[in-house]
Amino acid sequence: MVPYLTMEKYGRIDSVLIHVGGPPKGDLLDIPEEDWDKANDMVLKPVIRMAKLVTPIMEKQGGGSIVNITTFSAFEPSLTFPTSSVYRVGVSSFTKLYSDRYGPANIRMNCLLPGFTDSLDLPQKFADMSSLKRLARAEEQAKVAAFLLSDDSSYMTGQSLRVDGGVTRHM
């Protein structure tokens, strides 16, 4: 496991970034139950599993920061991505619960909700959804993640920060 290898090599874990792949898609009621289970296994369970692994370590060392990368549409579900919409809002809920429970141990957990990013091969219509009329650059998202993981955000926890170029400005 990565946490154990990290502890062996560095002796501590100060921050963890959790980013999972895209779960199965389909028409809302046509998605097989197995795909709903797969989506849960891909999106929500890795966050819970990693938290279980690193929390005791972070408690012993006096704190840490965990960032979950989800999606800008976590709170505005999309019929295009139904399983993602359902389970990523679950990640945000888990993040809030975790923050309440482990904040006193100086362990922070936040979510980064990125918009459409240039690392994906997307048509212009997705860029046009942004107030800025462009896709986010991957390094822009990375800088926000680095901020959330750093001590510069030491008073932020339980938050879901949208970095979507204004796509959700009306929601």
Each predicted region: which residue ranges?
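Substrate-binding pocket helix/loop in short-chain dehydrogenase/reductase
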Residues: 27-28, 35-40, 126
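Alpha-helical segment proximal to the catalytic Tyr-Lys
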Residues: 56, 100-104, 154
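A short, exposed helix-loop element centered on a Lys and neighboring polar residues
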Residues: 51-52, 96
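Catalytic loop of short-chain dehydrogenase/reductase
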Residues: 67-90, 95-104, 116
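Short C-terminal tail/terminal secondary-structure segment
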Residues: 76, 146, 157-171
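Active-site loop of short-chain dehydrogenase/reductase
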Residues: 12-14, 58-70, 104-107, 159
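A conserved structural motif in NAD(P)-dependent oxidoreductases
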Residues: 130-141, 152
